Amino acid sequence: MHGLLLAAGLLSLPLHVLAHPQPSTSTSLAGRAGAVDLNEFRVAHRSSYTSHDEMKKLPSIASFRQGTYLEVATELVKQTMPNMEFRLVDDHYVGDSGIGHVRFRQTMHGIDIDNSDFNVNVGKNGKVLSHGNSFYTGPAPASNPMVKRDFIDPMQALNGVRKALNLPVKADGAHVENMSEHKVMFKGTSGALSDPTAKLCYMAKEDGSLALTWRVETDIGDNWLLSYMDAKESSKVHNVVDYVAHATFQVYKWGLADPTEGKRDILTNPWNLKTSPLTWLADGKTNFTATRGNNAIAQYNPDGGNDYENNYRPSPKNLKFEYPYSPDMNPPKTYIDASVTQLFYTSNVCHDLYYMLGFNEKAGNFQVNNRGQGGKGNDYVILNAQDGSGTNNANFATPPDGQPGRMRAYIWTRANPPRDASFEAGTIIHEYTHGLSNRLCGGPANSRCLNALESGGMGEGWGDFYATAVRLKPNDTRKTNYVKGGWVNNSPKGVRMYPYSTDMNVNPLVYTSNNKLNEVHAIGTVWCTMLYEVLWNLIDKHGKNDGPVPVFENGVPNDGKYLAMKLVMDGMAIQPCNPNFVQARDAILDADMNLTKGANKCEIWKGFAKRGLGVGAKFDPKNRTGSNQVPNECK
């Protein structure tokens, strides 16, 4: 076991590539002339969610035959969607709150309908707690397309996607290798970080019809795309999913949002052996002396490339990751050792805290070695400090469980000297939380469940929520306001529309604000504002633990801050694929019902209702209905 001395500065930052704080009005393919606006290809909201309260009004699950949580879930799908063809997705697990999470994928003629899912949440009592459903119910294709093979070949699909989205991928001289009956890999291409693939699948369209498509996967760095090209017409792209959502350690310790909030400290062995039993500097096979271990691998990436294994990373004698840094140092490369160390530290603390709250191996977390605890390994987070592929941003790519996540932290040029995103914890926590939400929502095997506009907005909001919750100080009250990204952006207003506040005069956002918003960061600000209200309601009821880790009593955090973080995380795993605000709210209420028997029902309802997501709120992508009503028992 490594004995380390850490110099720390508190960081509270948080593949699906998700970009961080940059205020913008559209989501485009990053950094290239002629980039296409991906909002035109977003997946539509199709999911329904049957909450615990609604389940009580339906025929009892007791009529189902007794069995395991998998058998109960399967029986529910059979009875709810009779005569439907589906398969069990191999990422089911029982979370640390005792809920069995089971997911099914609809199929047609043995071919997946890629956006048709059914998730079932089975409670500790063996009965269904809730479920989500986006199964396709329209007419089935008359014949199996594999019989006549009346569809374009995959190379045509790749070229069609390349042209339609203006991708920097070249396929001249490339050839196709079969991976399975419905999936191929393209060998000999250039312009992508890994070999593109194509999988034949159906897509349920917004108009209620079904399209046979090639799902073409291309990782081009700042975008990691799943593009659904029509299998009959090589110029028609139906939808696009982007996986990217743009020793001793001398660091800013956990809880410090940026260099303005405190000084750097030297920390010795800062890991938690309950959540990182191999420490941060080993993977069970190798003990490392650089910023590399089971949870993450951090390095300098000035050219923005993908060859991270051979990039520079600090490797000090005696494991003393102690390097000079001050915000006045310039150019940034002069303090790269401190930058990589800080990024490595903050991301590992994220891993450990989220593990305690339920994001473990079974739930699809990021680790090389899962030590036989479930899930798929070989997927630490690749952490690129001072990444040269961009500026004034950060992003995180979340592929399914078993493939490494990738975070890129950029230099911000809004100040002189420039500022390094590695030193703003809120940015790093926000990005890491994209990995959390994309693995939990839809299950570890499906990173495509936060791509509808409101769903993607919640992905941004969760990142801000965890970054803000970690940042709370001992003397903070519900009157305390916080901005997001103020330091890196060199702006007291930060990078969001409003500060996070419980004061309607400071932050007036409500649910119907979304009717005028069409960008995920803006919608995420509305969602985080609601969660901030819930957070303070729970803190006012249960108090606030200002320590770096939660204290549990019978599996429940004993304070309001960590309880809010736990309930929000549990809600991510309960909700359906591509949820809307109403469904995500109900999932948090169901998480509380499971964890505390609904002891916090009214605090949660009042927080949401204050911001227009009360009992009567209704989702319509073009005309949402707000409500300030709470259940009668909460009045």
UniProtKB/Swiss-Prot annotation:
Its required cofactor(s), as named, are: Zn(2+)
**Disulfide bridge partners, by residue number:** none
Keywords associated with the record: Glycoprotein, Hydrolase, Metal-binding, Metalloprotease, Protease, Secreted, Signal, Virulence, Zinc, Zymogen
The protein's name in its UniProt record: Extracellular metalloproteinase 1
Residues excised as propeptide: 20-246
Q: Which residues bind Zn(2+)?
A: 430, 434
Q: Which gene encodes it?
A: MEP1
Q: Which organism does this sequence originate in?
A: Arthroderma benhamiae (Trichophyton mentagrophytes)
Q: How is the cofactor bound?
A: Binds 1 zinc ion per subunit.
